[in-house]
Amino acid sequence: MYDNVTFHRIIDDFMIQGGDFENNDGSGGYAAQWYGYCNGQAMSDAADCDSETKYTLPDEADNGLFHLPCMVSMAKTSQPNTGGSQFFIMPDDITNHTWLNGVHTVFGQVISGCEHVTTLSQVQTDSNNRPVTPVIITSATVSEE
């Protein structure tokens, strides 16, 4: 799903964001399966959602995990339960980002190579925080270790 997807938003000392497998610009992406939400609204049945591209994830931001260096977190809109396929990774040189705790769901950690995340967080970006030179995930592997 994430092969050849770009990191479309990069902010130094904050995060690198990617996961928009539809448009590679931050405007797309959705949950891979039904979790009971359509564009952030709870629904009892997937048939009530008019499109699979509107499937979203429930917020699980109070799971005991925090926004520390090298953590992976779910990107979403400012509305509850609107996470989809987009995510962001915190570089290892971040300062205090506790304001994200309880708002965005932390669900993973970079176990090895976080210095590369930090290097990516320092690439040149335009006024919209988009990398001037595309930063692409050529291949992604999920591990449940």
List PLM regions with ranges.
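Cyclophilin-like peptidyl-prolyl cis-trans isomerases
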Residues: 1-145
